[in-house]
């Protein structure tokens, strides 16, 4: 055996030993690892180091399957009238008498969040930026918050 073969055998042996040491370390600290993961589960929703967003699979909401930031629903302050739920699709609306639509407004941010991310399946959406109302104040506001 030449010196190059001995070098590779030593490196391979060291690598295998490190794997065994890591495996034993995980085995010894498995309880602590589970406790750590349970404590820090709230950080599941943060971005990972690789840049891909991690999804919080414990709670399903409307933004889980959307990757475009402008399409995600958010609660924003509406000028003088509380909070509204908005995305590039428009505003969430209330349907009144004679099928009239008005933007659904909330008194507090928490009410807006609770409604926007609840399990409501049928949501009416009003997009003020669809012709013929492209230059109205509601459309300008929607563009400004996206």
UniProtKB/Swiss-Prot annotation:
The chain crosses the membrane at residues 1-21. Keywords: Disulfide bond, Fusion of virus membrane with host membrane, Late protein, Membrane, Phosphoprotein, Signal-anchor, Transmembrane, Transmembrane helix, Viral envelope protein, Viral penetration into host cytoplasm, Virion, Virus entry into host cell. It comes from Ectromelia virus (strain Moscow) (ECTV). It is a single-pass type III membrane protein. It is found in: Virion membrane. GO terms for biological process: membrane fusion involved in viral entry into host cell; symbiont entry into host cell. The keyword Methyltransferase does not apply. This is Envelope protein OPG155. Belongs to the orthopoxvirus OPG155 protein family. Part of a stable entry-fusion complex (EFC) which is at least composed of proteins OPG143, OPG147, OPG155, OPG086, OPG094, OPG107, OPG104, and OPG099. Formation of the viral membrane is necessary for the assembly of the complex. Interacts directly with protein OPG107. One of its GO terms (cellular component) is membrane. Envelope protein required for virus entry into host cell and for cell-cell fusion (syncytium formation). The lineage of its organism: Viruses, Varidnaviria, Bamfordvirae, Nucleocytoviricota, Pokkesviricetes. Residues 22-146 are virion surface. Contains two intramolecular disulfide bonds. They are created by the viral disulfide bond formation pathway, a poxvirus-specific pathway that operates on the cytoplasmic side of the MV membranes.
